């Protein structure tokens, strides 16, 4: 089966496995060029956990950045083609070997860049957790707004924290306040929503605040 057909329907993890197998075959054919191939194989081993996480998030998060995933697949497909072509070169063809070796080095650097995508992956997790919290909050707001407006005073403070083995998103402070001014014209309550959360892994704080009248 051609590499392009394998990559078309493959998850990123499977694409990495195809590349790993291609490197292994290339090293068996050319013992004198194992150094650059060992380096590329080590980079694949390093990014495999991250790629597995990207695969998982692409299935769970709606409207995930599909272009990023497709770009990574294309990069892995290119890597397989380079490695296979490099392995087929004859020993005497030094000029082509030099060119392919340089291209493999550049591609290996691009794959190492994928490690930096870890920051973006954590942001996807933060967004997923925030969407779940906002959905829960919207449900509570609907219940509140359906109540009568005759002198209702409601205040609730809630703090929760949730952690996982790879990402920890902590909601350090969430307050929902409804202040109702009783008047003769039957005015509706004012709702002040303030969400504050932080990521322990990246040590970043974020917050959202908006007011509904």
UniProtKB/Swiss-Prot annotation:
Keyword vocabulary terms for this entry: Coiled coil, Glycoprotein, Hypersensitive response, Membrane, Plant defense, Transmembrane, Transmembrane helix
Cellular-component GO terms for this entry: membrane
GO biological process: plant-type hypersensitive response; response to fungus
Spans traversing the lipid bilayer: 7-23
Membrane topology of this protein: Single-pass membrane protein
Inducing or repressing factors: Expressed in leaves after powdery mildew infection (e.g. Erysiphe cichoracearum UCSC1).
Residues the record marks as carrying a glycan: 157
Coiled coil: 70-93, 125-147
Cellular localization per UniProt: Membrane
Boundaries of every RPW8 domain copy: 1-153
Main location (coarse class): membrane
Role description: Probable disease resistance (R) protein.
Record family assignment: Belongs to the plant RPW8 protein family.
Listed name of the protein: RPW8-like protein 3
The species this protein was found in: Arabidopsis thaliana (Mouse-ear cress)
Source species taxonomy: Eukaryota, Viridiplantae, Streptophyta, Embryophyta, Tracheophyta
Gene name, Swiss-Prot/TrEMBL: HR3
């Amino acid at each position: 089966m051609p590499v392009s057909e394998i990559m078309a329907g493959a998850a990123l993890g499977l694409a990495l496995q195809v590349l790993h197998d291609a490197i292994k075959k290339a090293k068996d054919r050319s013992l004198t060029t194992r150094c650059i191939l060992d380096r590329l194989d080590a980079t694949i081993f390093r990014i495999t956990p991250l790629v597995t996480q990207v695969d998982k998030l692409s299935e769970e998060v709606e409207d995930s950045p599909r272009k990023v995933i497709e770009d990574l697949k294309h990069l892995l497909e290119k890597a397989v083609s380079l490695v296979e072509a490099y392995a087929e070169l004859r020993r005497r063809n030094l000029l082509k070997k030099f060119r392919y070796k340089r291209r493999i080095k550049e591609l290996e650097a691009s794959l190492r860049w994928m490690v930096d995508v870890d920051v973006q992956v954590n942001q996807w997790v933060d967004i997923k957790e925030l969407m779940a919290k906002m959905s829960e909050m919207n449900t509570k707001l609907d219940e509140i707004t359906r109540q009568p407006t005759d002198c209702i005073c409601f205040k609730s403070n809630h703090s929760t924290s949730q952690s996982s083995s790879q990402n920890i998103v902590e909601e350090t402070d969430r307050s929902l306040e409804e202040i109702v001014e009783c008047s003769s014209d039957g005015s509706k309550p004012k709702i002040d929503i303030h969400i504050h959360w932080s990521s322990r892994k990246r040590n970043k704080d974020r917050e959202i605040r908006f007011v509904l009248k």
